[in-house]
Structures are given as C-alpha cells and as structure tokens.
C-alpha cells in the first residue's frame, strides 16, 4: 500500500458499529446497482455525488444519504472522509472512483475502509503491470510491440488508466501510428505523457466478450456472474456504412464506450472462461496480495479458432455489470434468484460481518 496503512484501516474498522454499516460509493459508473444491491441485502447506502448530477439517484431512490461535492475528486477531502467514517462506511471502488479520485490519492490520502484490494487498482491502470498479471497466470494474450517503429501488421493502440476506450485506435504502420497520434493530440484526447506510455498490441479479429467474475476471499472461489459486449462510438456507426462509403471518407474511428448490452457465450467455451479466471486469481495472489478480492472483469476476444484471448482486465466492478442489475443467466444458475454484482458485493460484506472476517475483504 501507499501511505494509507492497512493497520490504520483496520483500526478504523474496529471502531465501526458493525450492526450499522453503510455501503457507499461515488455517484457514477456502476453506483446504481452497487447501492440497490446493498439495499437488497439490508444495508444503509450513501453516495458522494457531484453537484448537479444527483438526479438519477434521487429518481431511482437508491441512496439513503447524500454527500454533495463540487467535484468528484473532493471525495478525498478530509471533511468528506470524516462524514463517511461517521456513517461506518465501506466504500466500493469502480472505474470513475479510480479516475476522479486519482490513484495516488486512493493510495496515500483516502483513509476510509474500501472493499477489495486497494493495491491492485494500480495494477489494472498501468499496462505493464496488468500484462504481468496475465503473463504470470499464463493467460492467452495478444502479442505486444515495444516500439511503434516495429508495427508490421494491424495493431490496437491503448493508453493508461480508465478511459472508456477514449483515444484508442487501430494502425497498420509506423506512419499511420504517428498520423493518428497527431490527430488525437489535436483533439485534446492525448498528451505527450500518454504517448510515451502507449500500449501497442496485435489486433485480434474476433467477437468481444467482457466477462464479469467475483472472487470470494471468504469461500476461495471464483464465480461467473455475467457477460456483456460494448456499444462504441464512432466505430459502431462507421461499420454500418456501405464499404464504398467507408473507403471514400477520411475518418479514423474511435472506440469510446457509450453503453453495454448483455451477452452469453457458447457453452463449450465455458471451460476456457473459468480456467483463465482461476489462473488470473492465482497470479494476483502471488504478485499483489491479497489478490483479486471481489469483482473483476476480463475483456476478451474469441477468434474463429474458438480461442478466448484476454486483452484487458478491470480489477474492480466493470461498467458492463450494469447489464445485469436484475441478474444474468449465469448468476441465476449459481443463486436461483436475481443477483447483480452490487448485490453480490453486499452479500460478501454481510457474510464477512456474520463470520467476523471483515479484515479478509477490506483494505
């Protein structure tokens, strides 16, 4: 961990009233089902919301308490932290929390108990660390290029952090790479520091499945909770154009995620789906203890050889979990009732309180 020490978090947790725990999160990303799931398991809920963005949470009535801030990043301010601690809050991280609060602040300044592994958030954000987790687990991944001058076939170019696909692009040569970098910088999507940390990997042609898992530290078991695919702008609109028109216009499609839709995968591929998750969980335990505690996502492509290839991970609840707020076919198979990712998180916290094992799932 950074300057936030585990023993200090445990001391705060020891002073909490375990009969009155509040589940809290930042008002964005996946907060609707995080809070609704907490309510379904009997918890009070709280949301830290940027001024002017509270309407969805009021309309859906998912929060018992509101902490309104000028900017999302204010969640790390001491007065906000104290309000959370006074509520006996356990904070659930998600992509927007990481992006707005900032990893340095989460590691060094945010002295509020968090569900899951605080340390692993940096491992998903930094491409080399993310890749190390996959390599250690011997998970099938795309080939990586160390320098744009080596590009000799179609590649996907990505950048650090939780961006929702913004700035990603495909290139087939060093010249095309440089041209598209210049265009992205002109749009204000990239800075020189981003370019220096560009992640270049082979473009895998296949169907996209974002696979959502939950690792229970209490039961030492990986659960498959759901899958989704993405609506991405502008590539989804671009591919609906006739081929002639695509060739005639000078457009570089972007891959900005604008929404998600649920998916199921061919049943014969499920052994690969479980195996790759089990491998990743074990490598995470080894490289960044206590590992992938709670929700995580493996973003994959399935090629025409029916190989499931992982190109990215999320080490916390992923935006695609919004597709199964009322449960998915896979969570139904496990639980026989509606089970969202938010509810599964709350259930883990509830079980940990009963077993007096909160320290296993909190950092």
Curated annotation (Swiss-Prot):
Pathway it works in: Purine metabolism; IMP biosynthesis via de novo pathway; 5-formamido-1-(5-phospho-D-ribosyl)imidazole-4-carboxamide from 5-amino-1-(5-phospho-D-ribosyl)imidazole-4-carboxamide (formate route): step 1/1
EC primary class: ligase
Location of the ATP-grasp domain: 118-354
Binding-site positions, ATP: 148-210, 232
Enzyme Commission (EC) number: 6.3.4.23
Signal peptide coordinates: none
Positions contributing to Mg(2+) binding: 299, 312
Cofactor note: Binds 1 Mg(2+) or Mn(2+) ion per subunit.
Keywords: ATP-binding, Ligase, Magnesium, Manganese, Metal-binding, Nucleotide-binding, Purine biosynthesis
Ligand binding (5-amino-1-(5-phospho-beta-D-ribosyl)imidazole-4-carboxamide): 29, 96, 260
GO terms for biological process, alphabetical: 'de novo' IMP biosynthetic process
InterPro entries: ATP-grasp, ATP_grasp_subdomain_1, IMP_biosynth_PurP, IMP_biosynth_PurP_C, IMP_biosynth_PurP_N, PreATP-grasp_dom_sf
UniProt cofactor(s): Mg(2+); Mn(2+)
Catalytic activity: 5-amino-1-(5-phospho-beta-D-ribosyl)imidazole-4-carboxamide + formate + ATP = 5-formamido-1-(5-phospho-D-ribosyl)imidazole-4-carboxamide + ADP + phosphate
Primary role: Catalyzes the ATP- and formate-dependent formylation of 5-aminoimidazole-4-carboxamide-1-beta-d-ribofuranosyl 5'-monophosphate (AICAR) to 5-formaminoimidazole-4-carboxamide-1-beta-d-ribofuranosyl 5'-monophosphate (FAICAR) in the absence of folates.
Family note: Belongs to the phosphohexose mutase family.
Name of the molecule in the record: 5-formaminoimidazole-4-carboxamide-1-(beta)-D-ribofuranosyl 5'-monophosphate synthetase
Taxonomic source organism: Methanobrevibacter smithii (strain ATCC 35061 / DSM 861 / OCM 144 / PS)
Gene: purP
């Amino acid at each position: 961990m950074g300057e936030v020490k585990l023993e200090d978090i445990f001391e705060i947790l020891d002073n909490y009233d375990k009969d009155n725990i509040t589940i809290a999160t930042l008002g964005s990303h996946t907060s609707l089902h995080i809070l609704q799931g907490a309510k379904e398991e009997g918890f009070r809920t709280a949301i830290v919301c940027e001024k002017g963005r509270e309407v969805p949470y009021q309309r859906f009535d998912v929060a018992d308490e509101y902490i309104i801030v000028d900017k999302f990043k204010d969640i790390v301010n001491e007065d906000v932290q104290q309000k959370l601690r006074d509520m006996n809050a356990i904070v659930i991280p998600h992509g927007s929390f990481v992006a707005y609060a900032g990893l340095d602040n989460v590691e060094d300044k945010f002295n509020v108990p968090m569900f899951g592994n605080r340390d692993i958030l940096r491992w998903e954000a930094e491409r080399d660390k993310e890749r190390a987790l996959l390599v250690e687990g011997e998970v099938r991944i795309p080939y990586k290029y160390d320098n744009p001058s080596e590009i000799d076939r179609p590649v996907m170019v990505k950048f650090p952090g939780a961006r929702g696909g913004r700035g990603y692009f495909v290139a087939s040569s060093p010249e095309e790479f440089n041209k598209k970098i210049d265009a992205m910088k002109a749009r204000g999507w990239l800075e020189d520091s981003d370019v220096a940390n560009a992640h270049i990997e082979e473009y895998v042609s296949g169907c996209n499945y974002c696979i959502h898992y939950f690792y229970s530290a209490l039961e030492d078991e990986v659960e498959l909770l759901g899958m989704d695919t993405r609506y991405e702008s502008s590539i989804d609109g671009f591919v609906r154009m006739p081929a002639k028109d695509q060739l005639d216009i000078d457009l570089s499609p972007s891959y900005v995620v604008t929404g998600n839709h649920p998916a199921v995968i061919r049943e014969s591929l499920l052994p690969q789906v479980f195996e790759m998750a089990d491998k990743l969980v074990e490598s995470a335990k080894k490289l960044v203890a206590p590992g992938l505690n709670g929700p995580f996502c493996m973003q994959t492509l399935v090629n025409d050889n029916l190989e499931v290839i992982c190109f990215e991970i999320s080490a916390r609840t992923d935006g695609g979990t919004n597709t199964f707020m009322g449960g998915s076919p896979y969570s139904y198979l496990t639980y026989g009732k509606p089970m969202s990712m938010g509810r599964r998180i709350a259930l883990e916290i509830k079980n940990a309180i009963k077993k007096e094992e909160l320290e296993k799932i909190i950092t």
